Amino acid sequence: MSMKRRIAVTLPASPFVKDSVERVRWAEANGYTDAWFGDGGAPDALTTAAALGGVAESVRIGVAVTPVYTRTPAVLAATANALAQILPGRFVMGLGSSSQTMMNGWHGVALEKPVTRVCETALLVRSMLAGEKSNFDGKTLRSHGYRQFPLESPPPIYLAALRPKMIEMAAEVGDGVIFNLWPKRALPRMMEHVKIGAERAGKSWRDIEIVNRAMVMVTDDKADARNRFRAAFAPYYATPVYNQFLAWAGYSDAAETIAAGWAEKDRGKTAGAMSDEMVDEIAILGDEDECRSRILADAEGGIHTHIIAPLAIGNSEETERTFAAFAGGRFHLG
């Protein structure tokens, strides 16, 4: 039995919780199956997810992803327990390592041993959700004596991953794997590492859901859309996590130039390292048919759930056009 293909709106919709509530209402009325949060700052994703309990009647709510360094496993397990009760059968806990900018800069927390930390967090949270009393001494975490009431149907735990070691661990330990900001040429290699991790755990890779946050802009002006993507995401690729991933994905020269430009505080050099071809490999830009075709191609490549994340920041008309292109009456994943 093949895994269901799903289409999601991205959340939060704005700095105001009420806008996320309205986006979910719109998504349900327009054939979307899911709504997935990013979890970086305000409004808090997990709190807002709880606010959707009285609103979301059918869509699945996910978080892609909560950084494992900002909450202890016991806090994550307690939060997931509550959200699973509020959204029974329709909540996915997404965990990941985040980036140096967010952890070191925003939170003052060292991003150390990310593969091990994500793995140990996932294992601990899963055991806590099952009601097991904690007795864990790991390389990055320890917990003793914590126990919470078990759920009959605990929420699945999905793990964010970019490069081989993290992808393999995520497929081995997680119930699903979350991708982000990858060039399309890298997808076959990424899927090979999903298969390796699944085999290590004795699982079929076909049973592991692959979620992707797709940066999309339905537009008649590709040049403008490319420049928006460069302005928004060149700084991402300057961080060590994404810079190393970009080099691994086949853009080592661009990665080197981006890092150098960022170190020199030269935003023009940083953004200019991203060629049109490279931007088109990562972002999904163009008219409705072009954007739909790329999502369908990604589905054929192994992506099950596509989070539509419009690039049209601050422009409600462009955002609405992008979301409308994937509404149920106009788009079908098959």
Located regions from the model:
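Active-site-adjacent structural elements that line small-molecule/cofactor binding pockets in enzymes
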Residues: M1-G334
